[in-house]
Amino acid sequence: MRRKEKRLLQAVALALAALVLLPNVGLWALYRERQPDGSPGGLGAAVAPAAVQELHSRQKKTFFLGAEQRLKDWHNKEAIRRDAQRVGYGEQGKPYPMTDAERVDQAYRENGFNIYVSDKISLNRSLPDIRHPNCNSKLYLETLPNTSIIIPFHNEGWSSLLRTVHSVLNRSPPELVAEIVLVDDFSDREHLKKPLEDYMALFPSVRILRTKKREGLIRTRMLGASAATGDVVTFLDSHCEANVNWLPPLLDRIARNRKTIVCPMIDVIDHDDFRYETQAGDAMRGAFDWEMYYKRIPIPPELQKADPSDPFESPVMAGGLFAVDRKWFWELGGYDPGLEIWGGEQYEISFKVWMCGGRMEDIPCSRVGHIYRKYVPYKVPAGVSLARNLKRVAEVWMDEYAEYIYQRRPEYRHLSAGDVVAQKKLRVSLNCKSFKWFMTKIAWDLPKFYPPVEPPAAAWGEIRNVGTGLCTDTKLGTLGSPLRLETCIRGRGEAAWNSMQVFTFTWREDIRPGDPQHTKKFCFDAVSHTSPVTLYDCHSMKGNQLWKYRKDKTLYHPVSGSCMDCSESDHRVFMNTCNPSSLTQQWLFEHTNSTVLENFNKN
C-alpha cells in the first residue's frame, strides 16, 4: 500500500513539474522565433541575457501578495558612499560657475539649455539626496517586476543624453532593468548616429531603435513601448538624471496593484548652470486649468498622510516621466495614435487610467531631475497643432466639461480633431466612467483653484496712475521682467489695447494681463518693500502675488506691507512705504466690482 502511495506521489510531482516547465519552454521558443536580427545599436545577441532573466523572473514571480512576501532595503549603500566623496564641476548637484563667455546664446541654440556647461560636467555626476528622511528607512518588496526604460530623443545633446543613461545605470538595481531602449525620432546630428551606437555597445542592456521619419514624442514613446520586453515600461525624457534608489519605489506600487500608474517626483535641473533642486512647493497634485495648461495644486488635508514620504493620488501627470505595467498600458490602448508630435498626451493617459479602472500616484521617495529647456530648439512640422491635440482629448474624454474649454478658447470650437470614432469605441469597450465622475471623485479639489465657471473679477481694464496719468503696460513684458508705465492707449487701436494695457484683478486676489475671460499666466509679483513689481508665473498661492485694492485707491501688498508706487521720469513701477496722500501711489481701474472688492477687504 505504501509503495502505491509513493508511486502516486511521484506521478503527481511529475505532472506539476510539467505544468510549470512546459509553458516556459514554449515562451522561450516563442522568443527565439521573434528575436530580431542583430544590427548595430539593435537588439542582437546582447538581449538574450535579459530575455533569460525575464524567463526566470516569470517563473518565480506571481505578484499575488500574501503573508510570505518579504521586504528589502534596495539602497546601494556602497554607490551612495562613492557618490558622497565625488568633487568637481556640478558634483552634488551644485551649480557650475559660469563665465560671461559661457552664457552666449550659441550655447543654448541647439538644445534649449547650455550644452557648453553640460559638456563640462561628469556623465556620472553625484546628486544631492533631497528625499524626505523617512525614505532612507523604507523597505520594498523583495521580488519586484523588471522594467524596460524607454528614452525617446530627437537631436538631443551628446552629454545630456549620455548622462541620462549613466544615471539610470548607476542608480538602478541591475536585476530590475530588463533593458534601456533609446528611441531616435529621426535625428540628423552626426553624434547620434554611429558614435552613439559605438558608445552604447559598451552597455549590453542598452539598445537603440530609430524611426524612418519624424514621428514626434508621442508616437516615439509608443514605438519604444511596443518593442519593450520588461514587465513594466518606464518612460523618461532624454535630458534627465535619476536620483538615489529611484526605481524600487515605483515598481513596488505596480507590484501591489498592476493598474497603478506611478510618477517620480520631478526635480529641476537648471538650464543655465545645471544646479539640481526641488520644484517650488515640492510634493503637489497635478491639475489643469480650463485652457488646458498643466498646473500643480497643494495636497488637501483630507489626502495628506501621516508620513509625507508615502505615495499620494494625483489627478494628472506632468508628462513624460512615469511607469506602468506593460500589459495594462496596452489594455488601455497606449497613447491615442491620433495625437501629433507632443502635447495633450499627459491628459489623455491620466483621464484614461482614472476613468477606466486604474489609479495614478506620485511617489515622493522616487526622484528624477529634469532639464526644463529655455525654449524648444527644434521646429514642429507644418500643420501640427497643439490645439488639435487638446481638442481631441476634450472630445473623447471630457464630455460636457469640454464646453468650459471652448468658452475660454473659442477658436477650438470649430477646429477639426480628426477621426475620434475608434477612441470613443475604446472608451466604451473599457467601460470607462464619466468625466463628471473624475471631477467629483478624483479631481474634486481642482475647482477651488481653477473653477470651470470663473467667479467675477474685482476690477479690470486699464490701470491708470493718478499722479502721472500713465498706464501700466506689458509691452516689454517677458516673464521675470519689471512692469512699466507707458502712455495710455485706450481707444487707439483694439489690437494694441487688448495685448498691452488690459489687466484683471481676479477672484484669486492677483493681477494678471488680459480681460476677465482671457487672462494670461503671469502675475504682478513683488518680493520686498522696495523691490520692482515684476511679471512672474502665476501660482495661485497668494504670497508675493496677493494684492488689496483699498478705498484710497492704493494697491497694497500685504506680504511686504508696502504699496505700489511709480516714477514718471524713468517709467518704473516699484514698491514703497505706503503714503495715501501720494498721487503716484493711487491707481484707477477702468472697471470695478464693488461687491467683490468689499468681500476681499473684509478678509
Curated annotation (Swiss-Prot):
InterPro entries: GalNAc-T (IPR045885), Glyco_trans_2-like (IPR001173), Nucleotide-diphossugar_trans (IPR029044), Ricin_B-like_lectins (IPR035992), Ricin_B_lectin (IPR000772)
Tissue occurrence: Expressed at higher level than GALNT9. In the developing hindbrain region of 14.5 dpc embryos it accumulates in the rapidly dividing, undifferentiated ventricular zone adjacent to the pons. It also accumulates in the regions immediately rostral and caudal to the dorsal rhombic lips differentiating into the cerebellum. Not expressed in the developing choroid plexus.
Pathway(s) this gene product operates in, as recorded in its UniProt entry: Protein modification; protein glycosylation
Disulfide bond recorded as keyword: yes
Pfam families according to UniProt: Glycos_transf_2, Ricin_B_lectin
Binding site for substrate: D185, R214, S238, W342, R373, Y378
UniProt keyword annotation of Manganese present: yes
Enzyme class of the recorded protein, top EC level: transferase
PROSITE patterns reported in the protein's UniProt record: RICIN_B_LECTIN (PS50231)
Domain-related comment: There are two conserved domains in the glycosyltransferase region: the N-terminal domain (domain A, also called GT1 motif), which is probably involved in manganese coordination and substrate binding and the C-terminal domain (domain B, also called Gal/GalNAc-T motif), which is probably involved in catalytic reaction and UDP-Gal binding. The ricin B-type lectin domain binds to GalNAc and contributes to the glycopeptide specificity.
Location of the Ricin B-type lectin domain: 458-590
PANTHER family: N-ACETYLGALACTOSAMINYLTRANSFERASE, POLYPEPTIDE N-ACETYLGALACTOSAMINYLTRANSFERASE 10
Protein name from the UniProt record: Polypeptide N-acetylgalactosaminyltransferase 10
Disulphides: C135-C365, C356-C432, C471-C488, C523-C538, C563-C578
CC cofactor: Mn(2+)
A single GO BP: protein O-linked glycosylation
Catalytic activity: L-seryl-[protein] + UDP-N-acetyl-alpha-D-galactosamine = a 3-O-[N-acetyl-alpha-D-galactosaminyl]-L-seryl-[protein] + UDP + H(+); L-threonyl-[protein] + UDP-N-acetyl-alpha-D-galactosamine = a 3-O-[N-acetyl-alpha-D-galactosaminyl]-L-threonyl-[protein] + UDP + H(+)
